[in-house]
């Protein structure tokens, strides 16, 4: 089976794990959040991985960096939603801390990738 370039990126692999963790965790959210925070968290988390993947299909570094920036913006959205979910008691502190650490790792990786793509 053919492997695509995005699959080889450590940041995409780390985000893939993050997506699975968020999906697992949000299964325990209250039913009334199914179309609120659950939907938003899942969509934003998937958006991180999707924009990393889409960016690898672009020909110029500038275009690639644009999609990495969008992925980073989606990550900031996820971090905000995790904070709110923790504040509302939907996520235990331990789970929040673990997700926050992974998000920070992904943030650093995205920044490094964006700097590389921008020639910096």
Please provide the spans of the model-predicted regions.
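Amphipathic alpha-helical assembly/interaction segments
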Residues: 1-120
């Amino acid at each position: 089976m053919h492997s695509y370039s995005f699959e080889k990126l450590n940041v995409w692999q780390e985000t893939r794990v993050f997506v699975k963790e968020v999906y697992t965790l949000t299964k325990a959210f209250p039913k009334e959040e199914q179309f609120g925070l659950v939907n938003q968290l899942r969509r934003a988390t998937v958006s991180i991985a999707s924009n990393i993947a889409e960016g690898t299909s672009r020909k110029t570094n500038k275009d690639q960096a644009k999609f990495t920036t969008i992925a980073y913006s989606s990550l900031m959205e996820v971090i905000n939603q995790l904070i709110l979910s923790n504040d509302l008691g939907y996520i235990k502190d331990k789970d929040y801390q673990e997700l926050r650490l992974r998000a920070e790792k992904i943030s650093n990786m995205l920044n490094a990738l964006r700097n590389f793509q921008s020639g910096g």
